[in-house]
A protein has these predicted regions:
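Class I S-adenosyl-L-methionine
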Residues: 2-171
Length: 174
């Protein structure tokens, strides 16, 4: 995927006017390399009506380059990942290979909690409180927003996301 901040509702949503917008460079690389399949991932903000023309331009460029295009909003938690992570996925398949593509169907009743998913890892070194943590971490985790050492570590998102992380036994401040 290309950087998400130009389209994120957590940012200024500057789209093409954001210096971090790398869609043009990505499309240039697709033209130069001519891969059989292209997969592009971005935040759901790109589905905003504000970006309709921009999104359509990306899809039309892929079509002009010889790709059939398919776009869908997917959520990782629908496929067994214990995190709320909705992402827009754009698939481009070279038309000389195929014109048909189907996104995977959701995995029913496959939603795992953070505790179920990470239990083995968390208990590997004999952590005595792992059972209590596993019971507490009984939900799907919110999306990590970002962060870096330069900016003080992970950003657990808005206040409600920080609270949700705390309920899972995660302190983003270390």
């Amino acid at each position: 995927g290309v950087p998400c901040p130009p389209f994120s509702v957590a940012g200024k949503q500057l789209g093409a006017d954001d210096e971090r917008d790398l869609f043009p460079q990505m499309l240039r690389l697709v033209q130069e390399i001519n891969p059989r399949i292209v997969m592009i991932e971005n935040v759901r903000g790109i589905l905003s009506s504000k970006f309709n023309a921009y999104r359509e331009q990306v899809l039309q460029t892929l079509k002009k380059l010889g790709y059939s295009t398919h776009l869908q909003l997917l959520n990782a938690s629908d496929y067994g990942v214990p995190q709320l992570r909705p992402r827009v996925i754009i698939i481009g398949i070279r038309r000389d290979l195929a014109d048909v593509f189907m996104f995977p169907e959701k995995i029913p009743e496959k939603t795992l909690s953070v505790g179920e998913t990470l239990y083995d890892l968390m208990s590997a070194n004999g952590w005595k409180a792992v059972e209590e943590w596993r019971r507490t971490a009984n939900k799907i985790a919110p999306t990590l927003v970002g962060g870096s050492k330069k900016h003080g570590g992970p950003d657990l998102g808005p206040t409600r996301a920080r609270k949700a992380w705390a309920e899972l036994g995660v302190d983003g401040r270390g």
